[in-house]
Design a protein with these regions (language model features):
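A short acidic, Gly/Pro-enriched loop at the edge of an enzyme's catalytic core
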Residues: 133-141
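Conserved SAM-binding loop of SAM-dependent methyltransferases across substrates and taxa
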Residues: 85-96
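Conserved class I S-adenosyl-L-methionine
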Residues: 75-84
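Class I SAM-dependent methyltransferase Rossmann-like catalytic core
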Residues: 47-61
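Class I SAM-dependent methyltransferase SAM/SAH-binding core
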Residues: 95-130
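Conserved alpha-helix/loop element of class I SAM-dependent methyltransferases that forms part
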Residues: 57-75
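N-terminal auxiliary segments of SAM/dcSAM-dependent transferases
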Residues: 1-37
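A short SAM/SAH-binding and catalytic strip from SAM-dependent methyltransferases
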Residues: 140-153
C-alpha cells in the first residue's frame, strides 16, 4: 500500500500497523505544524519565535551542517536509514537524484513527507529496516542518529 503527500511517496508495504517508537504527543504538534506551513521559509520563521528544544531539534536547518559540506555525486541514489521527521532528508533530496528514507514510525514518516513535500525524488518506506526487502543498489547510505533506537531493531 502507498500514498502520496504532494510529490512524496509513502510506502507502507512493510509497516506492521504499529509505530515502534514515538516521542509522544509532541509528534502530533510537529505534524500539525508541517501540515500548515507553505515551505521551509515558513518553518524557519516559526523557529525564530520558538524556544522549545523539540521544535529546534526536529526543524532547524542547522542539522544540515552534518553533511552539507560533502560533495555528493548528483546522479546518485541514497538510502537514509532512520529518517525520523526528516531533519536532513531535504538536504539529501537537494544533493542526489533519488532518496529512499526508512523509518519505524508512520507518524514520523508522515511528518517527513509533509516537511519535504516539494521534492519529487523522495520515497519513504515505513517499517523496521530488518523486515524491508530492498533489491535496489544505492551509491550512499546514511545512518545518522539511529544508534539511540537500536533497541527497537
Amino acid at each position: 500500500m502507498e500514498e502520496y503527500i504532494n510529490k512524496v511517496k509513502l510506502n507502507y508495504d512493510f509497516y506492521s500497523g504499529k509505530d515502534e517508537y514515538s516521542d509522544g504527543d509532541i509528534e502530533d504538534k510537529l505534524l500539525e505544524i508541517v501540515k500548515n506551513i507553505k515551505d521551509e521559509e515558513d518553518l524557519e520563521e516559526f523557529l525564530v519565535n520558538e524556544s522549545e528544544w523539540t521544535y529546534l531539534y526536529h526543524f532547524s536547518k542547522i542539522r544540515h551542517n552534518i553533511l552539507d559540506w560533502y560533495k555528493f555525486e548528483k546522479k546518485a541514489s541514497l538510502l537514509e536509514i532512520g529518517a525520523g521527521c526528516g531533519a536532513i532528508t531535504g538536504l539529501f533530496c537537494e544533493k542526489v537524484d533519488r532518496v529512499v528514507a526508512v523509518d519505524l514510525s508512520k507518524k514520523r514518516s508522515t511528518i517527513n513527507a509533509y516537511r519535504n513535500k516539494k521534492y519529487d525524488n523522495l520515497e519513504i518506506i515505513v517499517g523496521n529496516f530488518e523486515d524491508i526487502k530492498i533489491s535496489e543498489k544505492f551509491d550512499y547510505i546514511s545512518l545518522i542518529g539511529v544508534l539511540e533506537y537500536s533497541l527497537y531493531y
